Amino acid sequence: METIWIYQFRLIVIGDSTVGKSCLLHRFTQGRFPGLHSPACDPTVGVDFFSRLLEIEPGKRIKLQLWDTAGQERFRSITRSYYRNSVGGFLVFDITNRRSFEHVKDWLEEAKMHVQPFQIVFLLVGHKCDLASQRQVSREEAERLSTDCGMKYIETSAKDATNVEESFTILTRDIYELIKKGEICIQDGWEGVKSGFVPNTVHSSEEAVKPRKECFC
């Protein structure tokens, strides 16, 4: 029997090269850390695709399409084309790499420039928190930046699985709540949110899972 999911969200993962975006996605979708010398942790060339179902409430599942983007400048033109069709994103930096943190605002501004006229919800992720002794960015500083930029902040480690599941759950639930409030709408021609496979009997919160030709969110 086909798995029931009420929505499909397309999420993009952005940030500098080597901050661990691919390792985070492997941990979340496959439940394992591929290892520092695994090809899975090599810098992404262009864009890679991952997928997983996430249950946000009992009996309510969201299908996540996850796009892992290259951090290198030569692939940025490819990355930019994926912003517009994403409803959410993880903006990842390495807590042991000060420069990756300093580039957070650049990534955010680039995303905002290319997402118009749609809305994208971001979560700021401080990765590699298992390397706390090598930290170059304090939690307090990262939290200040996230507040200034209107994002939530979480620290994760793909190596020991710290907060990996939680980070994807937080962003997925935030988007789901905005849909229920009518602040994010399903629209024809936009891939960010799609209605899913639901039973004939739907709950009131799911009755709005219908595409709209116009949205004034």
From Swiss-Prot:
Positions of GTP binding: 17, 20-23, 44, 71, 127-128, 130, 158-159
Co-factor requirement: Mg(2+)
Compartmental location: Cell membrane; Cytoplasmic vesicle, Phagosome membrane; Late endosome membrane; Lysosome membrane
Enzyme Commission number(s): 3.6.5.2
GO molecular function ontology, one term from the record: G protein activity
Similarity-based family: Belongs to the small GTPase superfamily. Rab family.
NCBIfam families: small_GTP (TIGR00231)
Domain remark from Swiss-Prot or TrEMBL: Switch I, switch II and the interswitch regions are characteristic of Rab GTPases and mediate the interactions with Rab downstream effectors. The switch regions undergo conformational changes upon nucleotide binding which drive interaction with specific sets of effector proteins, with most effectors only binding to GTP-bound Rab.
The protein, known as: Ras-related protein Rab-39A
Species name: Mus musculus (Mouse)
